A protein has these predicted regions:
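Hydrophobic/aromatic ligand-binding patch that stacks against planar heteroaromatic rings
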Residues: 89-91, 143, 167, 184, ...
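PLP-dependent aminotransferase class I/II
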Residues: 37-41, 50-52, 124-128, 138-139, ...
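Structural detector of well-ordered beta-strand residues that form the stable sheet scaffold
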Residues: 53, 78-79, 99, 151-152, ...
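N-terminal "arm"/small-domain region of PLP-dependent enzymes with the aminotransferase-like
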Residues: 1-28, 339-340
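Phosphate-binding glycine-rich loop
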Residues: 29-76, 90-101, 166
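PLP-dependent aminotransferase-like
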Residues: 67-155, 162
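Active-site PLP attachment segment
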Residues: 170-209, 213, 233
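Conserved active-site segment immediately N-terminal to the catalytic lysine
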Residues: 153-188, 217-223
Length: 366
């Protein structure tokens, strides 16, 4: 018998009422109302920087961040082959060339793999904090400093993750966030944010997202080719509502569910690698990934995951194709099962997923 899982996202009545108020006001464009600026200020304060710029989606955040850093034609950027494609195609969008490095068993780039991919044309590295895990940023930042590289943090799946007590997105030169439908929070289906300690970077993003506007000019003047990548007032008011309840409801539930999964399955004989969650690298768990030991199964990992899914539980097979052939990444992407930990779930939903995993493992392990 399959279960009916709670949907995600779900918006509370307070946020829905605020959306209605914005609609009634008729001030729905970023430049006609106050909510866009309010959302940016609230997010900047929450993440721990002074500068934040909202954009239309996470892909735009990455693209505009690279252009704001001066990355362009003739440059190379080190990327992971193991992420949603926007984590690398943003480099092409900026006119530069992505160069792929392999990942570690934690699913993410590390300093050693990045070092092997650096050439005389390398100008930056994009570090993806995958699945809500936090990359080992200390050695990466040290390498970048030695080699004169910019560090872009792709935090699309890691809102609220921390490295040595600092939120992801504030460690490198620029941090990029996504508020797409399935993410930790959404601004009504799409949305993104760019943050930086460097006001010049965020001013450049602010200009690029608005057709090349010279920030602060009135009447508007333009000095570069830009784009239309602004959030609407409706999206911003949704973002404010989701941010307000993130630390009190959303993130604690994700972490509690993840801790239960780690206790229950971290030592299971079928699990080869469990997710990284330490005091130094504090995960925020978009999902909880376990890498399975395929040699211990009588079937493929894909077939195993399909069997677990038949119990109606929230597990996920990684669907992204690799963007380059790298051995560690290839071994991970086909053998990883992800457990959703949406805050709308109940403890019983997570317990049912554990039960289904164990049942199928008992039947399908050699």
């Amino acid at each position: 018998m399959t279960r009916a899982l709670p949907s995600w996202p779900q918006f509370n009545p307070k946020t829905i009422g605020r959306v209605a108020a914005v609609l009634k006001s008729g001030k729905v464009n970023y430049w006609t109302g106050p909510e866009g600026a309010r959302f940016e200020a609230a997010f900047a304060k929450w993440v721990g920087v002074k500068n934040a710029v909202s954009v239309s989606n996470g892909s735009a955040a990455l693209h505009l961040a690279l252009e704001a850093l001066g990355i362009g034609r003739g440059d190379e950027v080190v990327c992971t082959p193991y992420s949603f494609r926007a984590s690398a195609t943003c480099v092409n969008n900026a006119g530069a060339k992505p160069v792929f490095a392999d990942v570690g068993t934690d699913h993410m780039l590390n300093a050693a793999s990045i070092a092997k991919a650096i050439t005389k044309r390398t100008k930056a590295v994009i570090v993806v904090h995958l699945y809500g895990q936090v990359a080992d940023m200390g050695p990466i930042l040290a390498l970048a400093k030695r080699r004169g590289l910019k560090v872009v943090e792709d935090c699309a799946q890691c809102l609220g993750g921390e490295y040595r007590g600092r939120k992801v997105g504030t460690l490198g030169d620029v941090g990029c966030f996504s508020f797409c439908q399935s993410k930790h929070i959404t601004t009504g289906g799409e949305g993104g944010m760019v943050v930086s300690r460097d006001r010049k970077v965020t001013d450049a993003v602010r200009s690029l997202r608005d057709h090349g506007w010279i920030v602060g000019s009135s009447p508007k003047a333009f000095d570069r080719i830009g784009y239309n990548s602004r959030l609407t007032e409706i999206q911003s008011i949704i973002g404010l509502g989701e941010l307000e309840r993130f630390d009190s409801w959303n993130l604690p539930r994700r972490r509690n569910f993840a801790e239960y999964l780690l206790r229950s399955l971290g030592g299971h004989p079928l699990v080869k690698y469990a997710p990284v969650d330490t005091k130094v690298r504090k995960a925020s768990f978009w999902l909880v990934p376990f890498v399975l030991d395929a040699k211990k199964l009588k079937c493929s990992v894909a077939r195993f995951i399909e069997a677990v899914q038949k119990d109606g539980v929230g597990v996920y097979k990684i669907m992204w194709p690799l963007m380059a052939k790298k051995p560690v990444a290839a071994g991970l992407i086909g053998n990883t099962i992800g457990f959703w930990v949406h805050p709308t779930y109940a403890k019983d939903d997570i317990a049912a997923a554990v039960k289904a995993f164990r049942k199928v493992a008992d039947a399908m392990m050699k």
